[in-house]
Amino acid sequence: ELSSKSHHSSLHKKAGFDWECYHRLYKFIKKGGYEVVHAHVGSIPYILLSAMLLRKVKFVATIHSEARREAGRNIMKWSRFIMFQHHKCTPVTISDESKVSFDEYYKMDAPMVYNGVPQYSAKCMAPLVDNNDQLLFIHPASCQKVKNQELLIKAFAKLVKDYPNVKMLWLGSNETFKSLYDTLVPDMVSQFKYVGTVPNVRDYLAQADAMCLSSKMEGMPMTIIEAFSVGCPALCTPVGGILNMIEDGKNGMLSASLSVEDYYLMLKRFCKLPSEQKKQMRLQAKESFAKYSIDNTAKGYLEVYK
């Protein structure tokens, strides 16, 4: 939801790369008289013209994942190099892992600001479990290849043979890659439920025993920060900035690799924990949220904007 102080405008970008967006964005920024322009992901190359011509404007770009992959190819890649290395745009990394990859790839130093979310306000919601002894897992991610749902679904199918009283709820859109979703459905056991998009993922995470990510690549997932904010441990693959967020056995767990077998073994390891250890893991997940508060994120970016 947008704050009343925020405004949404569309540049009516065409599908694929849209050369006209360079000029439209330049005119939009110039007319608005903005002091700071902050770009993310696919919008970064489109600020090139504006960054070269509008010298009184501070341009900032957040790098959300591993630098080489995030840069892409051709114009996506060289536009970043031009802006960053000629100091036309300030790059910001979001984790220790992403900073290392950025510094090595671009041969320059970049500031780091952790992602953050506001404190969670508990809401009354019907129980999501079918019985008091059931373990509840939440998978908060849209359906796409990089999120690697195939691994999660197959690993969970193995888990239910050992622990049938478990439940996985998949929260996220399947509309963009509907054909991919259709190929995954046959492997979903009855305890694996697709819910779709929900207004507030944290209402679900607050009831979960753990959240699960099986990604092939990540920067610093907001979903893990959201999980920590409600004291929900994260069970993830060992990729990207996740390695800087999760201490195995403390605020969550990491699989040994990106194989189905290793992810299954991690899930099984969590299920075998005594209830007291699961409770302790929840407390440590909550404690981990401290450095990911939105207040710290805001302070970090205000320093960058100076």
Q: What does each model-identified segment do?
A:
Residues P233-C236, I246:
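Short hydrophobic beta-strand element within catalytic cores of glycosyltransferases
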Residues T197, K216:
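Aromatic "clamp/platform" in nucleotide-sugar-dependent glycosyltransferases that forms part
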Residues V129-K147, I153-F156, L169:
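Conserved donor-binding/catalytic core segment of Leloir-type glycosyltransferases
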